[in-house]
Amino acid sequence: MKFATGELYNRMFVGLIIDDEKIMDLQKAEKKLFELETIPGSLIECIAEGDKFVAHARQLAEWAKKPNDELGSFMYSLSEVKLHAPIPKPSKNIICIGKNYRDHAIEMGSEADIPEHPMVFTKSPVTVTGHGDIVKSHEEVTSQLDYEGELAVVIGKSGTRISKEDAYDHVFGYTIVNDITARDLQKRHKQFFIGKSLDTTCPMGPVLVHKSSIQEPERLKVETRVNGELRQSGSASDMIFSIPELIETLSKGMTLEAGDIIATGTPSGVGKGFTPPKFLRSGDKIDITIDPIGTLSNQIG
C-alpha cells in the first residue's frame, strides 16, 4: 500500500496509490462509498490511527474495484495530481543518522570516522519539500551544497524503551529522503543543524509505503543519480546500525511518536567524497530511487 499527500484543484488530500497509475482521494471515497466522514485530512493524523486507518483504506481500495458510476469523483490519474511530501509539515524535527554506512564514513574522513554508536542529529521541519519541487541553491550562504540519498522510516506507534525485537511493530512505513547538506556551513559551525536545515533541503517522497508492502527493508537498494550519472548505490543491509538498532537506541530515553521520521543514513558517493568534490549547482537534477517506493526527483533552482 502506497500512501501520498496529493493536491488537485488547490485542495490537499490523503491519497492511496492504485496500480501505480491512479490515486484515490480517501476522504471523498469514504463519503461516496460508505457515506462516512471518519478519515482525517492529513496523513500524519491517519498514521496516528494505526491499524484502524490501514484496514479502512484497504477496504476502500477493494470497494473501488467494483463497478461504480461515481469513480471519477474520487479516483484521479496520478499524472494530474501534484504530490507533496507524504508528511509536508512534520510535528517535530526529522531525526537523522550520520555515517551509518562504512564506506560513507571513510569517504568523509578515514576508518577512524566509523562510529561505535549511532551519530544522531536533526533537520528542521521547515526543510521538508516534495517530489518535483525546486530546491533552493542558497548561493548567498553556501558554495558546497551536497546530496544524500536515504531510506527513511516513519514511526506508526508511539513507544519508549522499544526493544530491537519489537521495533518493526512501531514502524508505519518507508519513504525516501534527500538529506541535502551545506558542507561548508556544517564545518564552520561545528554542529550539523544549520548546515542541514536550510529551507527546502529535505525533499521527501514521492510516497509513503506501508510496511506490509516491504517485508525485508534491510534488502532495499538506494541509488542516487545527478544529471543521470549514478553517484550512489548501496543496500540497507550495509548499514552499520540496523533499523531495529536505531529505534532501540533512540527510544531508550526519548518517546518516539506516530509520524516521527528517521532518515537512516546515506551510502558512499556523496559529492564531497569525489576528488575534486562534485557539489550541486543551479540546474542540477537529483533522482533517488528505492524500489518499491519509487524515485524522488528534484532540481536545484
UniProtKB/Swiss-Prot annotation:
Chief localization: cytoplasm
Catalysed reaction equations from the record: oxaloacetate = enol-oxaloacetate; oxaloacetate + H(+) = pyruvate + CO2
Binding site for oxalate: 99, 196, 266
Organism: Bacillus subtilis (strain 168)
Classification via InterPro entries: Fumarylacetoacetase-like_C, Fumarylacetoacetase_C_sf
Protein name: Oxaloacetate tautomerase YisK
GO-annotated cellular components: cytoplasm
Transmembrane segments: none
Keyword annotations of the record: Cytoplasm, Isomerase, Lyase, Manganese, Metal-binding
Organismal lineage: Bacteria, Bacillati, Bacillota, Bacilli, Bacillales
Induction annotation: In response to ammonium, tryptophan, glucose, and phosphate starvation.
Keyword Metal-binding part of the UniProt annotation: yes
Binding positions (Mn(2+)): 148, 150, 179
Family listed: Belongs to the FAH family.
Subcellular location: Cytoplasm
Gene Ontology BP, a term: oxaloacetate metabolic process
KW Cytoplasm (keyword) present: yes
Cofactor(s) demanded: Mg(2+); Mn(2+)
